[in-house]
């Protein structure tokens, strides 16, 4: 009795088949997303929707989806595909990286600012296209690529978009779960984990945004918080009401709770910068070594404190892109490799902790996902100590596709709600 989840990422597309009783992944398949279309326009970041669909249909076959209990999707948020009245794509996928809405519009504002959302968000991209005559003539609706994939495999003519994806398009009221602008191409929205149709007789759940799907696929206890460390880093937790301040963003979840999220733009990149610095220093001594991560890990095995401080906002913040990080409180005794490495990890943790504490959350435990913390024992120790919480690491790293599968199990009637479904998540022994 398997459930299938597929996550359509920017660079890869991952599918899993999950045993609904044990919670084990019985099969996992990942394909590179080689659908980017070369463009002469510097701001344009688009992908070929048909190439993406070829990968999706291939995964459905490899995962034996036609014999599954239910199928779920998640995917890269913010981007849009235009569809016609038959449900066919009329455009490439304008991805979240597309920066056309950051171009100057009128009155000293960009297209995104004029609309009231961020560049890369689907409705900002659509606004630019509308103003410049680029919306396909027969377009009747727009949606994310995961919505499109779910709609296509069901043979539907129009998408039904979950609030987790709808909000990512911009101009969305998360309390009322509706769009705040008039646009004839806006899709129908749902707050439920519900089936939108069937694939060869198997129910297909409304697609989720990858952020919320990753939370669902990682966190078994709704009182826990999730820390994800990749190139950037993020802390998120469920809240009964919207959370304001401290660099936090509130996102829709299930119509009952919200997902509070604090994002650090540098995150794991800060540790990568440190490793690059150490390699550069080693090369000065004639040692053109490869990765120094194993050596840094060993250096930190017994390191428990430092008087050196590091502000790791090296890439700015969402609210202030121009702010920069710093190394402080340097003395003749603490400017060492071990102290610097420990200070950077401490700074990475503190940036997340400051956002967490401003939201007033007191988590029971911290779930840690993403290779930046899965593979870094020293960072886990620092995070655990700073937050005062026990650490849990999901057994499976395919969090978004796993979360999509759990949502599908709810849509297929195998669990009463998403919180019940999450109880089958397994964790590594620490």
What are these regions (language model features)?
Residues 8-10, 110-211:
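Gly/Ser/Thr-rich active-site cleft segment
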Residues 67-76, 140-142, 226, 361-371:
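Short glycine-rich phosphate-binding loop at a beta-alpha junction
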Residues 110, 126-133, 138, 151, ...:
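A short helix-loop
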Residues 56-69, 132-136, 180-184, 352-365:
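Phosphate/pyrophosphate-binding loops at sites that engage ATP/ADP/AMP, CoA/4′-phosphopantetheine
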Residues 213-217, 263-268, 272-275, 342, ...:
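Glycine-rich phosphate-binding/hydrolytic loop that grips phosphoryl groups
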Residues 1-91, 138, 202-206, 291, ...:
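N-terminal glycine/serine-rich phosphate-binding loop of ATP-dependent small-molecule kinases
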Residues 304-396:
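Activation-segment/catalytic-loop signature of the eukaryotic protein kinase fold
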Residues 166-254, 266, 378:
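ATP-dependent carbohydrate kinase catalytic cores
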